[in-house]
Curated annotation (Swiss-Prot):
GO terms for molecular function: DNA-binding transcription factor activity, RNA polymerase II-specific; protein dimerization activity; RNA polymerase II transcription regulatory region sequence-specific DNA binding. Residues 23-36 are annotated as: Basic motif. This is Hand transcription factor 1. Residues 1-15 have a biased composition (Polar residues). It is found in: Nucleus. Disruption phenotype: Adults are viable and fertile, but with a moderate frequency of somatic gonad defects, which increases on an ehn-3 mutant background. Low frequency of embryonic lethality, with embryos arresting paralyzed at the two-fold stage; increases in frequency significantly on an hlh-1 or unc-120 mutant background. Many embryos that survive to hatch become uncoordinated, dumpy larvae with variable body shape defects, typically in the posterior. One quarter of the embryos from homozygous hnd-1;hlh-1 heterozygous parents exhibit reduced expression of myosin myo-3. Its main location: nucleus. GO terms for biological process: developmental process; gonad development; gonadal mesoderm development; muscle organ development; positive regulation of muscle cell differentiation; regulation of transcription by RNA polymerase II. The keyword Transcription regulation applies. Residues 23-77 form the bHLH domain.
Length: 226
């Protein structure tokens, strides 16, 4: 009996807490709704004080533009009250500022995009730029798809170490099927070249030694030629 009473009390308390949460949410929503209505009505009243706005422009005019136009209109009225503000026309003539000159501020503000629209417009690219970016991305994909061994080494690369008299050529061979780099070294055979006489001064010059490669040794050491 006691257990059933405790369970009932817990259920009642949970329902009360749930109802209190719902009521708090509803109250906060109603408060936010009244706040939004007050702000909208205040902006509608502010728009009525801005001249030279068409009815369709008033309906679609954002709040930030309404604030900017209101500040510009206040500055314009201050200049009119001063009486010393002059405006330069297209014919390079000066005339006093009038109330109707505020139409220029209206047209300029309506023409300007909002900040987020302006950022989106600046991010738009022309067709040539898009093609150039796509071509660069395609080339990058092609280069990244080639194996690393093929990118780094050509099928044959020779590296020479030491003087010519003790020349050792190191060939790097790339297997296109397994992309493994194999190294093979062989010592070139040197042969002495005969001295040739100079027909003008009758002196002999030693043209040095030249490497001679035996084709049979190259075939035995190179797996491609086998």
């Amino acid at each position: 009996m006691v257990k059933s009473t405790t369970a009932g009390n817990n259920a009642v308390s949970s329902l009360e807490s749930t109802d209190s949460k719902k009521s708090r949410k509803e109250k906060s929503r109603e408060k936010e709704h009244r706040r939004a209505q007050c702000i909208n009505s205040a902006f509608e009243i502010l728009q009525q004080h801005i001249p030279y706005l068409k009815s369709e422009e008033r309906k679609s005019l954002p709040k930030i533009k309404t604030l900017r136009l209101a500040m510009q209109y206040i500055d314009h009225l201050k200049k009119l009250l001063g009486g010393n503000e002059m405006l330069e026309t297209d014919c390079n003539e000066s005339r006093p500022l009038t109330h109707s000159d505020f139409r220029v501020n209206i047209s300029n503000e309506i023409r300007i995009r909002n900040s987020y629209r302006e950022r989106a417009h600046n991010q738009e690219l022309d067709e040539a730029t898009v093609k150039r970016i796509l071509a660069r991305e395609d080339q990058r994909r092609r280069c990244s798809s080639v194996p690393e061994g093929i990118q780094r080494y050509t099928p044959y690369q020779s590296r020479q170490f030491g003087p010519i008299s003790n020349n050792v050529c190191n060939f790097r061979h790339v297997d296109a099927n397994q992309y493994n780099t194999n190294f093979m070294e062989y010592q070139t055979q040197m042969v002495q070249v005969a001295n040739f006489p100079n027909q003008f001064s009758h002196e002999y010059y030693n043209y040095g030694t030249f490497p001679v490669i035996d084709p049979t040794s190259l075939e035995n050491s190179n797996p491609i030629l086998q």
